[in-house]
Amino acid sequence: MFNWRAIYNKILYLLLKIVVRSHIIPPKLLAEICLDIQEPMMYVLPYNSKCDLLTLRILCIQYQLPDPLKPIFIXGVRFPRYLFIDQSCHIRSDVTKQQQYGRILHNFITLYRHNSCSNIQILPVWVMFGRCPGKESYKNKKTTSIQFFCLLKKIINVIWLGRDSFIYFSPIGSIPISYIANSNYTINSIMILKLFRLGRIHFLRQKRIAIGPSLLVRKHLFEKLLASQTITKLVEDEARSKKISIKQAQQKALVIIEEIAADFSYETIRLSDRVLSWIWNMLYQGLYVCNADRVRKLAEKGHEIIYLPCHRSHMDYLLLSYILYHEGLVIPYIAAGINLNFWPAGQIFRKLGAFFIHRTFKGHQKLYSAIFREYLYQLFNGGYSVAYFLEGSRSRTGRLQAPKTGTLTITIQSMLHLGKKKPIILVPVYISYEHVIEVASYTKELYGVVKKKEGLIHMISGLRNLRNLGRGYINFGEPLPLLTWLNQQVPQWQDDINSIEGNRPNWLALTVDYLAVTIMTRINNAVAVNAMNLCSSIILASRQYSCSSIVITRTRLLSQLKCYLELLRNVPYDAEVTVPNVTPEDLFQHLITLNQFTIKNNSIIYVSSEKTALITYYRNNIQHLFILPSLLAIIIIAQPGISRKLIHQKLLSLYPLLKVELFMRFSYQELPHVIDLMITELHRQDILYEQQTKIYPVPKRMDELQLLAASGGRETLYRYAITFSLLCSYTRINRYSLEKQSIIIAQHLSKIHSIYALEFIDKTIFSTLITTLRHEGYLSDSGEIHASQAKEIYKFLSALISPEIQTSITNALYHIKTVVN
């Protein structure tokens, strides 16, 4: 006699193997959900679906997990390896089915209690075909026609969305069946119903994590925005001031809303996923993601997540959304500059969740800023994930830029405006690449070339740079719970909930500034160290300023790589930093594949003068990791036999400037201990030695110490020396003049000494430096200079820079003062 059910299952299984290609969530399955494949397990699914069960079976066989169709035995009693919570995704289980599932669960728990030696793992699994938001589950309808249409819809979904299916595995214990089994609770029908209810809640929560709330309908959104009290008042003011009708003013507001608002499209996301998967595989040698599991856990707890990534490239928009989608998380609404709103990129980005904003609201009307603020309120209130770049624009130097706090201010205002204690989590995100396609244009912009406007022609011309881009890295940093943080920093913030629109609390500006710096510091803490940024640091350090090109031997590069890797591993900057767990030789072999350098006979690395400026971008990605070791090496080379105490004093005097400029994490109290750890590590590497509390370089390892000294610290000292020389030359100088003259001298030094560091002539970095000098008391708001403090620092700096650089600064300063007078 034929087993028709087995034949049916086999045919369906083979068809699904052809049609379905599932993504597993989480990608690192065994590690994240604490699964022991040696122990027996039972799969719990949300509803009875043969397609889902067989799709799960395909994946289980692929990953060598227990086959869900094979039963498990407890004390000789046979149980199915799977359990359904409900009969259908749209229909609550009928009484018969509910009782059947209930009996299975009751018998399972009873036998589990009597066989305590058994450690059976309960694994909740949800198979999802497509992730289009807005679908409702568990409707209380039950008719034959509805069941028929559900089946038809399932068939269509499997065929149409089979290549876009996701299988979500929840951690062991997400549905507390094992906990109940191990407890003293009485197992009766009420307890079984409670367990089923907990299962439904878990899967509903899982659905929210995966697909988010229903998509915003643009028409309804526009009506909501226009109906808000703030915008209604501003529309009336606009009509009155411009002497136009209310309808014309509303039309003007609608144009602004149209310009800003995203237009999410799930089909566009599906198509883009296919295209981007092909692009990443073709152009990159891999995408490396770290700590995505911590974001997933936050989402599981019901937190609303705001992603705050650093900004390196236009690729960031696509990469962040792509990674989140493949990690099983909702794609966020992401802020994009209005410069990207050109055909066809603007329409595509908008369909992928981009909303467009001007880089600054200065010069724009009140109506625009009010509409943008109200739009963000709607996103936050609706529970949508949001992402925006605190830096405001792409970094041209490879470092983090000073944060733009406008959108962050609106984020905090939204909590006050909505009057709710929403569990908002700010997630810093570090994004980096071994090859940034725009880096050549960044260099030109810093040297004064006018930035080209983005457009279709510009985009097409940039496609020729899309080749061999190495690896991409995305690290999710330490999350910051906004509510908890506000309670610590501003305990009285709740007094301003529902405050009058337009009246900012007195504490808001300073709080936002401090919050922005905290986020930027956490982004830097999550830096990804890779072959390109490590080797770029060493290669640039080996350059002689009299030479435009660079030549370094393989042996020298490998020796310094070993030094740097050991320093990063043994004196970690932060636990969030990711350091490649490979040998220096492995890094070098990977460097060869990037084709960024000319390598002769596999032993000599040659870098042209044109490339020298470009690779400073990658060195700057990790400059905050090596700035303290670099300055330490400079001090010891300049003053061999210096004491630890004096080293502490010198570095502490510069640290306020470094901390602000590079968003460094150490407090002033921690710094001496960190310096001592670095000295100890360099002593262990036989690069330094200590004699009678004095620190000396080891002569035979002087080359390693000199390369370490040149890893970003020298150019920093040159910039500081320029600005402090100006402070010592005047009794009073305004901020604008100090900044302008510092840049002129820096440009002069850059030209005559071939200093290619991108940040060396960056106006924003000098602006940040001068702001810090004011905060530290070297310069008053009125322009008065505290000469004694400035002269003390300049004397210290002069002892650390070469006589040639010092002479050039003096000559340039004399020339400037002559012109001014």
UniProtKB/Swiss-Prot annotation:
Gene Ontology biological-process annotations: CDP-diacylglycerol biosynthetic process; fatty acid metabolic process
Compartments in which it is found: Cell membrane
Short sequence motif HXXXXD motif: positions: 310-315
UniProt entry keywords in alphabetical sequence: Acyltransferase, Cell membrane, Lipid biosynthesis, Lipid metabolism, Membrane, Phospholipid biosynthesis, Phospholipid metabolism, Transferase
EC number: 2.3.1.15
Reactions this protein catalyses: sn-glycerol 3-phosphate + an acyl-CoA = a 1-acyl-sn-glycero-3-phosphate + CoA
UniProt superkingdom: Bacteria
Single annotated GO MF: glycerol-3-phosphate O-acyltransferase activity
Pfam families noted in UniProt: Acyltransferase, GPAT_C
CDD domains cross-referenced by the UniProt entry: LPLAT_DHAPAT-like (cd07993)
Cited NCBIfam families: plsB, PRK04974.1
Protein name (record): Glycerol-3-phosphate acyltransferase
Annotated organism of origin: Baumannia cicadellinicola subsp. Homalodisca coagulata
Upper classification of the organism: Bacteria, Pseudomonadati, Pseudomonadota, Gammaproteobacteria, Candidatus Palibaumannia
Gene: plsB
